[in-house]
Structures are given as C-alpha cells and as structure tokens.
Amino acid sequence: MTVQLALVPILLLGTAAVMVHCMPFSSSQRNDTLERRWETLFSRSMARIPGEKKDMSRESDYLLGIKRLRRLYCNVGIGFHIQVLPDGRINGMHNENRYSLLEISPVEVGVVSLYGIKSAMFVAMNAKGKLYGSRYFNEECKFKETLLPNNYNAYESRKYPGMYIALGKNGRTKKGNRVSPTMTLTHFLPRI
C-alpha cells in the first residue's frame, strides 16, 4: 500500500516534466517565459493582491507588512513585560498577562508601531517623553526599532528623536528624555 502511495508523486512529476518538455518553445524562450511567470506569481503573492505586480528591490524592507505578536521583556529589576492597560496607562508586569501581548507592525523601513491587543490601544510617547495608550494611530505612535549588540531591541520615538521607551526597576515607565540606549532599562527582548 505504501509503495503505491509513493508512486503517485513520481507519476505526477513525470507527467509534468513531459508536458513542459513538449511545449512548442525554444530553450531560451521557455526559460524566459517560465521566469516571467514565476516572477509574476511571486510578486502577486508578495503583494497579496491578485493580478497586481509588486516591484521587489534590495532596498525594500523585508519585514514590511509582517505583523509580529510578541511580549516585550525588559531585564531590569526582577524583569518586566511592558503592558498597555485599557485606561491608557503603560507599565511593566513581571508575569505575562493578556495586556502584555503586543502586535509589532512595521509602518516604514525600520519604524514600527506597538499595539496592545487586549486594550486595543497603541503605545505612544508625548513631547515630554511620557508613555501613554492611544486609541488612534498618530505620529507619536511610531518608534524606530534598533537591534542592539546584545540581541535586545531599543525603541526610539520617531517624532521625538533621542527619547526611548524605558521601564524602571520597579516596573514603572521612565520618561524618554531621561534615558539613553546604553542603559539596560531601554533594552527589550521580543518574546513569543
């Protein structure tokens, strides 16, 4: 019985090879046609829009459009996961909970938004460096994500450069203008 099941894929591949070989194109035309078909299929699947071709280049962000569900862990004090509460407060909690699950979505090359799934709020930073939860996406919700040498990430406000997301050793947020990326309280490990 298993021998018969193993023969089915071999027969299908053989049939496909014969069909391709019998096409009325020369070798170079066949390769060009297959290459164009593959490029079109690949670009359509990347764009996720049937029939629309998307230009792929080396400069394009490989994470553009990929949303990641993660918990951001800061190894300061006893270790905290950043959480977004329904009332808009943001702080750190030692144990994982439903408010610490974030959707990290790219909005530009190297720039992400952090969205609290349960609270339905974006992480945002105001001009004074204070973190808050925003119901609506705006410029204060954009953060530059930087991979650090220790494999942690730092999140710098896009609107207010030099201000970073940070948690203190007690789990409370620190003002973004009082910290730097060299401080461990700005280092976050995205965890599944």
Curated annotation (Swiss-Prot):
GO biological process: fibroblast growth factor receptor signaling pathway; neurogenesis; positive regulation of cell division; positive regulation of cell population proliferation; positive regulation of MAPK cascade; regulation of cell migration
Chief location of this protein within or outside the cell: secreted
Keyword Secreted in record: yes
Keywords on record: Developmental protein, Differentiation, Growth factor, Mitogen, Secreted, Signal
CDD domains: beta-trefoil_FGF4 (cd23316)
Function: Plays an important role in the regulation of embryonic development, cell proliferation, and cell differentiation. Good candidate for an inducing factor with possible roles both in mesoderm induction at the blastula stage and in the formation of the anteroposterior axis at the gastrula stage.
Name of this protein: Fibroblast growth factor 4B
Gene field: fgf4-b
Alphabetized Pfam families for the sequence: FGF
Lineage start: Eukaryota, Metazoa, Chordata, Craniata, Vertebrata
Organism the protein comes from: Xenopus laevis (African clawed frog)
